[in-house]
């Protein structure tokens, strides 16, 4: 299982839990649909909702898990806790979600980070240690802290 699938497997097994998947491109939507069919309590919203509908759904969530991406900022707009995963970029570069707790960022401190301002460059180390070092257990632990 991929890291994302390991996190979904763990979280979706909880009673009284609903996990909503948000996404964009055609390849991503296909994967999210497959995950929604495979894991219990998982619903893919990718490509199905307007932005206003997404914001309304997010406003009722206990937490949002995101990469450094647009959904982090949307969740921040509706003032819900966001657990954000950072790889090549860094929240100190000014891209953190509005009014979000720095304690809810998951990142590996490496001297090569940030390797680019907006994450568009390839890893010069060739190992993507900034993301590979983040484990499903780290993510689940952060989510548990937020929702407990």
Regions found by a protein language model. Name each.
Residues 1-88:
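Donor-binding and catalytic core of enzymes assembling or modifying cell-surface/extracellular glycoconjugates
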Residues 44-45, 76-147:
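Nucleotide-sugar donor-binding patch of glycosyltransferase catalytic domains
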Residues 32, 147-148:
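N-terminal non-cleavable signal-anchor helices
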């Amino acid at each position: 299982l991929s890291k994302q699938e390991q996190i979904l497997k763990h979280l979706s097994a909880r009673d009284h839990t609903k996990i909503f998947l948000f996404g964009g491109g055609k390849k991503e939507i296909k994967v999210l649909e497959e995950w929604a069919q495979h894991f219990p309590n998982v619903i893919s919203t990718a490509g199905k909702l307007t932005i206003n509908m997404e914001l309304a759904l997010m406003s009722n969530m206990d937490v949002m898990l995101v990469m450094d991406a647009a959904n982090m900022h949307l969740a921040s707009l509706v003032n819900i806790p966001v657990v954000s995963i950072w790889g090549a970029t860094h929240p100190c570069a000014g891209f953190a979600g509005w009014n979000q707790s720095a304690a809810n960022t998951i990142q590996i401190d490496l001297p090569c980070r940030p390797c680019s301002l907006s994450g568009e460059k390839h890893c010069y180390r060739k190992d993507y240690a900034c993301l590979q070092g983040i484990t499903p257990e780290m993510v689940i632990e952060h989510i548990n802290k937020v929702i407990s």
